[in-house]
């Protein structure tokens, strides 16, 4: 397992060997006798997997699996599992944290208040930056899987118009699906 995995909790199931960050060349050597590999961003392709003759399982502490040669694993009977939806809401929420920070100047207003400028102001509500609302604005979402659809739901709560592009055909209430170029 890599250093992002709680090895102490896994040791009840068998011998656990934990490594820090490895170079690509070190990975093949380290997993040669492994039955199972649990990792996050470690690249596991034919070059790093071909010596792992006992390998039966790769577990990913990640939503994506683009770092794994899925076809090689399929041909060699290696099961691959990811954590497909573990961060869906956190990522959608963070998307709006960034939108609100950028669009509403949250950091600048927080500094304005912390520096005492709000209190010293001669007006009731000193607006250093324009007040912007998300209502009525349009958001474009590329990819409408679990994260994209969660972002759309939050956008709808802000009364935004939602446009989305997805490679495969999808439908969702209140979402207009358009081509990538149109988006």
How should these model regions be labeled?
Residues 1-34:
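N-terminal glycine-/charge-rich "phosphate-binding" loop or analogous flexible N-terminal tail
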Residues 10, 29-30, 48-51, 182-183:
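Structural alpha-helical scaffold elements that stabilize or flank donor/cofactor-binding regions
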Residues 12, 125-183:
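Rossmann-like dinucleotide/phosphate-binding beta-alpha-beta segment
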Residues 20, 40, 61-62, 78-89, ...:
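Short beta->alpha connector loops at strand-helix junctions that form conserved
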Residues 34, 52-55:
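An anion/phosphate-binding loop that grips the pyrophosphate of nucleotide cofactors and donors
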Residues 66-78:
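Rossmann-fold NAD(P)-binding glycine/threonine-rich loop
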Residues 76, 84-138:
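Phosphate-binding beta-alpha-beta segment of Rossmann-like dinucleotide-binding domains, i.e.
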């Amino acid at each position: 397992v890599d250093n992002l995995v709680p090895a102490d909790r896994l040791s009840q199931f068998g011998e656990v060997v934990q490594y820090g960050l490895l170079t690509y060349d070190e990975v093949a050597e380290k997993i040669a006798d492994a039955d199972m590999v649990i990792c996050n961003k470690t690249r596991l392709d034919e070059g790093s997997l071909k010596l792992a003759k006992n390998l039966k399982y790769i577990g990913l502490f990640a939503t994506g699996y683009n770092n794994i040669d899925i076809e090689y694993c399929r041909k060699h009977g290696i099961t691959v599992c990811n954590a497909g939806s573990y961060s869906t809401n956190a990522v959608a929420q963070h998307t709006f944290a960034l939108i609100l920070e950028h669009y509403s100047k949250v950091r600048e207003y927080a500094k304005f208040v912390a520096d005492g400028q709000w209190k010293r102001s001669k007006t009731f509500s000193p607006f250093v930056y324009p007040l912007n609302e998300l209502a009525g604005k349009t958001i474009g979402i590329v990819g409408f899987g679990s994260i994209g659809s969660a972002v759309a739901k939050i956008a709808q709560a802000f009364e935004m118009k939602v446009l989305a592009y997805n490679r495969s055909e999808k439908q969702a209430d209140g979402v207009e699906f358009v081509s990538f170029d149109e988006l």
